Amino acid sequence: CLQAAENADINILTRVVDYGGIFLGTMKPDHKFRDGDHRTYRPSGWVEEGLSRVDKMRSIIDKYDLSELHFSCLWNLSHAPVRSVVPTFIQEAGDDAKPIEDLVREYGSLPIESPFSQAEVDEIAAIGDNTGCMMLKGASNRHAESLRPDEWPMRPELMELADRHGLGSEW
């Protein structure tokens, strides 16, 4: 998708660059979420799996003396069509959680340029590849009809568009 966007001269804003809070630096295994937090609907063990992947990226994070939030933002910005990044600021539960104001200040001090080499960008992508970990929302071949507001059948014209840009058909 990134290559298709670049080929079409489309700029991208990536959101949730903190990956559900994993890169905010405050989550621990067995993280306790506030009542009503939408992340509780994710598959069991996602926090632990995410944190294990962050640990595998630690040498690159430390090499550049980055916070986890800066690391995730800069990795996203390392991709040519990505021009802006937006984390999700959520006040986590617990006395040891970072105040949301501190997270906003940290985000505001983001370095302007990514320090990563292409080899590091590729290494981070390989470590973080979570293809197939959750059902994607939106248009998909999985849906024959719209049973939920965030899932709907893939229309033929969307498949034609995906094919034209080399995006495949396995959605």
Which residues fall in each region the model found?
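Structured C-terminal cap/extension of enzyme domains
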Residues: Q3-W171
